[in-house]
Amino acid sequence: MKKLLAFLMAALMLCCVGCGSKPAADPTDDVAADEPVEIVFWNVFADDSDTGVFLSQVAEKFMAENENIKVTIVGQGGYDAIVERLEAAAASNTLPTMAIIEETFLGRFYPLTVDLSQYLSAETIANYQQGLLVSGYYDGVLRAVPFNRSMPNLYINRTLFNEAGITDVPTTWEEYFATAEKLTNKDKGVYGAGICWDTDAWIFESILYSHGGDIISEDNTKIVLNDTTVAADIVTEYQKYIDEGVVFNPYIYQDNVWSTIGSAFLEGKLAMFLGSNGVYSMYNQWMKDAGYEMEIHQHPDAANGIATGAGNIVVFSNATEAQRQAAAKFMTYLASDENAAAYTVLSGYLPTTVSCVNDPALQTFLQENPFFQNAIDQMQFAHRRPQTKAWKSIYTALADELAYCMTYTDTDASASIAKVAEQAQTMLDEG
């Protein structure tokens, strides 16, 4: 309770700072060349990871071109870890200038962030992929912009499709399970499909949207998860196909669920699964090394809505005016065609801007990996995720219950969803 009160007090103090009489900055103004300024950028990458190294290299290039601005890159160990450290920093008024946060955490941190429309040019904002930008607004104010963003896509082992004599890739859920049945080869230990709901129930959330369901009302005041039978029906259907040996169930193993399902896919024991496009480049190389042909396609029934995920960049309101302008300049630099395209090629994350898709490096990547275009085209169906500070507690309860339903497939899914919905409403009401 003391930690929460301290966090809220810090939020109020910072909001008061942002409500002063100082006029909004002109987003076209440059930081004065004779005024050195340092910006600190917390991120979710390991310093020695490909993405961490990329960010550091881009910062070095930026500083070489802007000698008055020092960019300090600090890896904070993942989305959950960075949230804990940001909360502690908020309580002690030691927040960094800017940070990457998972998009759903904007509901917790928006009081501490600046309105980016006051610092980024209209041209820069308009060039972001609008499907990815939907989660950057809170109460109509632009608080975050996309950086390392992803969506669930359908990964298939084309080699197994060919062996089963199947050409068409399923585009609806009805086709998905029908195709999974045809792909299943129990003699060879091959499952037609697999499922991992993810630790924050992200995959379940996306499947729910694609079925026309939802978790929370648009105004973030009411849990609607159990208002229809859609959520329970999804779980029940997966339980059925698991019991029939059509869907691979990683929840019955002791290992990490994603690692288990990934290993099954790489070993040719799994023909299809829903996963983040953010692992595309890595998985594609691994599958080639294993002698398999992999493709990435759109999520079944994508047009009904698909969850987006991963990181957005925010700037905190405790930053000085010079730091805010410098941060905006660095964000604009990250969103340049060259840098945005290079990041997609390196990581497999979605291209964050419209124009970077035409960059020569990304065009070459698409020529070599034509199925990745499906991930790009799917962005138009992005569905805004819950933006409430109670979301972490809610998704933890949901993910735990979903895992239980998979571990014990005779569990009544209707009762489980009803229980989670009731718990989630209490969490939402308590804030």
Annotate the PLM regions.
Residues 1-40, 64, 122, 356, ...:
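Short, low-complexity disordered leader/linker segments with a strong preference
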Residues 34-48, 69-74, 97-98, 143, ...:
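Short, well-ordered beta-strand elements
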Residues 47-70, 398, 417:
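Short, polar/charged alpha-helical segment
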Residues 60, 64-65, 164, 244-247, ...:
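Extracytoplasmic/periplasmic substrate-recognition and gating elements
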Residues 61-128, 137, 159-167, 171, ...:
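Extracytoplasmic "Venus flytrap"/periplasmic binding protein-like
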Residues 77, 83, 101-153, 162, ...:
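Hinge/lid segment of periplasmic solute-binding proteins
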Residues 180-182, 221-252, 299:
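Glycine-centered hinge/linker elements that transmit conformational signals in sensory
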Residues 294-297, 345-400, 404:
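Long, aromatic- and glycine/proline-rich binding clefts that accommodate carbohydrate-like moieties
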